[in-house]
Design a protein with these regions (language model features):
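Ubiquitin-like/PB1-type beta-grasp interaction modules and other compact soluble beta-rich domains
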Residues: 1-81
Length: 82
């Protein structure tokens, strides 16, 4: 299982705090997970944004980060302000 959490605007857009997904062989990296989620269509396309940030097991990482069964993943937009 992969536990996925959505934060800030992603949570609002998707109407979902998080979900648990079965891990499988075509989910080797965070990029592949993100592609599968965005492919759901509709509001899920928000996860295809260039400025998406992610964390694996509470550590910030790149989308190239390998995924393993039991990981906790978080997706959130970049922080901006003025």
């Amino acid at each position: 299982m992969i536990n996925v959490q959505y934060f800030a605007r992603y949570r609002e857009t998707l109407g979902l705090d998080g979900e648990s997904l079965d891990w499988h062989a075509d989910m080797q990296t965070l990029a592949q997970l993100r592609e599968q989620l965005a492919a759901r269509g509709g509001a899920w396309a928000v996860l295809a944004e260039q400025n998406l940030m992610c964390a694996r097991n509470q550590d910030l990482c790149s989308l190239a980060e390998p995924l393993s069964d039991g990981d906790d993943v978080a997706f959130f937009p970049t922080v901006t302000g003025g």
